[in-house]
């Protein structure tokens, strides 16, 4: 029987050897290149394959169509996965007529997902095991072919349990693989009601919170003991790792995290105390507990921390280019509300941010990003987070000035992106909902929707493709050079200070500002191509709160993510927006100061925007990533946004224009 194998780690080696021993013909093995940042203590699948004369590959993306085609050409009868770290898509799974099988390190359906070895120890389980199961689209959910139990002894830590699981897996494969080959398997469906799932472990999962019981912390030490990265704590700002420990009953009333004694090195916990048997300072060597306490300068009564304690907390420096714009000025207001941000801003005007100019944590320079390149480079080096918000983002300019759109939106921003790469700075880049173009999906999804634009002779797409190419450049810099980034895509944000009425007079504004100008001047509201195009309108306060959470980046959850920020519940056509705005206008206390409503007028897009324009019928965001990364949900109803936006502009007109 001809097999294609996906394998890594010790389990990968023993799986490959078991297949060879069972008489399988292995056509190819797919594995991973070792990560230099990872401590490699396990066997090499690639070396084993090479010694056995089997072709071996380590692709970056096994699910790429080219690799799927190459696997199809191998014509496998069966597919096996032994601790391969990437999910295989359905296109690969269906290539094997006798099925695809995966070796998992737990007693499924318990502990599906990543790192079951570590999670069972941390959770204090006394039993785990190994499972061979069919592979289906849902991870670790297929029917069970074989299963073997493994007892977890109190003295077991990660490495000893790993060795037990490897031994048990070898025994199980010895009888399971011939059964698969002979078509004599007995399969048991998994009970979904009993399923549990655990994700990839993150560094913060190994923080030792001294408020927890000593038993819980001891289990955490066991779960990530050497050669895993280890459980850790801090003495002030100094990090140290505990490699092995022992639980003691509480011997006094010390506060959690207090050092009860240094010989033995005993630390008070929420319940009981933890004795450090062996440990290591961040730049030191492994040593026994009492020596470690001495090395760390600890005495009885010293306090430990779960997080580093800094005597002086420097404010996070945020550079906003285009700080006077709609998003920039609202974001500045939100950041300055907190005392831990310092905002540096550049723009060609300051009318929208004049209220911040005297704030001690706000630093502004009036200037043009195409001229002030030295200032920009210096402040990118100086700041922690960079938001390049400068762009031409009004549709009429895409057809009126396409080259200027390209020069500013693409070329100037590319220079800023490269500075961020050069100086290792985090960039939060404003992509746009425009990148989805004429996508036909019901909900536009950051990770799966196609980005579809029109022909070259439609210059309205120059903004969309400029932004899309920058998205791709940033993504590539993240993948290849470690750029820390987040892309966010606003969906029709509205609110006070969106454009201004002077911009609307020359057609260079967003839809609602243009409609308000029509009402203020008593001119007809123009409905481009009938105004049936639908958009999802988002209140600026909802949008800014999401953007603020991206800047906060709790748990680094936003790194490398693309995040739609919009309100899918606030969907309306431009015609409906105009009618809602008219109703709000008629109820406004300043209504009497303005001319009568001049009605709606349907106009062709070519006569308004020019011959190079194309419109999009609908644009509704999926906000799955925003919910997952930001714990964010839009809350403000569209009518409230319309009322407040209209009120802001009408009062501006009354104060400024009517008095002139």
Curated annotation (Swiss-Prot):
The record marks 140 as: Raises pKa of active site His. The record marks 102 as: Transition state stabilizer. It catalyses: UDP-alpha-D-glucuronate + NAD(+) = UDP-beta-L-threo-pentopyranos-4-ulose + CO2 + NADH; UDP-4-amino-4-deoxy-beta-L-arabinose + (6R)-10-formyltetrahydrofolate = UDP-4-deoxy-4-formamido-beta-L-arabinose + (6S)-5,6,7,8-tetrahydrofolate + H(+). Residues 1-304 are annotated as: Formyltransferase ArnAFT. UDP-alpha-D-glucuronate binds at residues 393, 398, 432-433, 460, 492, 526-535, 613. It comes from the Bacteria. The keyword Oxidoreductase applies. Residues 314-660 are annotated as: Dehydrogenase ArnADH. This is Bifunctional polymyxin resistance protein ArnA. The lineage of its organism: Bacteria, Pseudomonadati, Pseudomonadota, Gammaproteobacteria, Enterobacterales.
């Amino acid at each position: 029987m001809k097999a294609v194998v996906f394998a890594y780690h010790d389990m990968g080696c023993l799986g490959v050897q078991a297949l060879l021993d069972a008489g399988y013909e292995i056509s190819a093995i797919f594995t991973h290149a070792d990560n230099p940042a990872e401590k490699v203590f396990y066997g090499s699948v690639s070396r084993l394959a090479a010694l056995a004369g089997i072709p071996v590959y380590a692709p970056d993306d096994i699910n790429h169509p080219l690799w799927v085609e190459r696997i199809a050409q191998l014509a496998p009868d069966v597919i096996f996965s032994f601790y391969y770290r990437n999910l295989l898509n359905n296109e690969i799974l269906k290539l094997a007529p006798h099925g695809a099988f995966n070796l998992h390190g737990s007693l499924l359906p318990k502990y599906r997902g990543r790192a079951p070895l570590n999670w069972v120890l941390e959770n204090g389980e006394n039993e785990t095991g190994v499972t061979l199961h069919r592979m289906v689209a849902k991870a670790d959910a297929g029917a069970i072919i074989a299963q073997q139990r493994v007892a977890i002894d109190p003295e077991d830590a990660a490495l000893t349990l790993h060795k037990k699981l490897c031994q048990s897996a070898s025994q199980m494969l010895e009888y399971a693989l011939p059964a698969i080959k002979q078509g004599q398997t007995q399969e048991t469906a998994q009970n979904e009601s009993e399923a549990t799932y655990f994700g990839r472990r993150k560094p913060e999962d190994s923080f030792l919170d001294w408020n927890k019981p000593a038993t819980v912390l001891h289990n955490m030490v066991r779960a990530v003991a050497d050669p895993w990265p280890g459980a850790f704590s801090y003495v002030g700002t100094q990090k140290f790792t505990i490699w092995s420990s022992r639980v003691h009953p509480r011997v006094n009333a010390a506060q959690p995290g207090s050092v009860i004694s240094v010989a033995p090195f005993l630390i008070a916990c929420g319940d009981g105390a933890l004795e450090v048997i062996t440990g290591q300072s961040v730049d030191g060597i492994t040593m026994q507990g009492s020596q470690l306490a001495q090395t760390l300068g600890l005495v009885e009564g010293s306090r430990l921390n779960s997080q580093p304690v800094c005597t002086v907390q420097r404010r996070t420096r945020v550079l906003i280019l285009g700080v006077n714009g709609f998003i920039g000025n609202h974001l500045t207001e939100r950041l300055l509300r907190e005392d831990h941000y310092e905002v540096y801003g550049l723009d060609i005007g300051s009318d929208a941010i004049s209220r911040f100019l005297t704030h001690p944590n706000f630093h502004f320079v009036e200037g043009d990003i195409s001229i002030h390149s030295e200032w920009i480079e210096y402040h990118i080096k100086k700041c922690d987070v960079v938001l390049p918000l400068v762009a031409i983002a009004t549709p009429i300019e895409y057809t009126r000035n396409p080259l200027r759109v390209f020069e500013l939106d693409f070329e100037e921003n590319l220079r800023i992106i490269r500075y961020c790469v050069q100086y290792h700075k985090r960039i939060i880049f404003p992509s746009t909902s425009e990148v989805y173009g004429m996508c036909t999906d019901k909900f536009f999804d950051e990770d799966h929707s196609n980005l579809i634009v029109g022909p070259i002779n439609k210059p309205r797409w120059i903004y969309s493709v400029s932004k899309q190419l920058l998205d791709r450049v940033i993504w590539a810099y993240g993948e290849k050079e470690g750029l820390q980034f987040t892309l966010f895509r606003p969906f029709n944000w509205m609110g006070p200070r969106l454009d201004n009425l002077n911009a609307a007079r020359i057609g260079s504004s967003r839809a609602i500002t243009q409609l308000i100008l029509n009402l203020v001047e008593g001119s007809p509201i123009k409905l481009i191509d009938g105004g049936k195009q639908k958009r999802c309108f988002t209140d600026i306060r909802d949008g800014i709160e999401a953007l603020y959470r991206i800047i906060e980046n709790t748990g680094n959850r936003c790194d490398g993510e693309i995040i739609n920020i919009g309100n899918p519940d606030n969907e309306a056509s431009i015609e409906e927006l105009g009618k809602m705005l008219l109703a709000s206008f008629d109820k406004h206390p300043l209504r009497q100061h303005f001319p009568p409503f001049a009605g709606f007028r349907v106009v062709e897009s070519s006569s308004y925007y020019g011959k190079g324009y194309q419109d999009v019928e609908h644009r509704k965001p999926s906000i799955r990533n925003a919910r997952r990364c930001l714990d964010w949900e839009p809350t403000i109803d569209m009518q409230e946004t319309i009322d407040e936006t209209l009120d802001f502009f009408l009062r501006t007109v009354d104060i400024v224009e009517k008095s002139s």
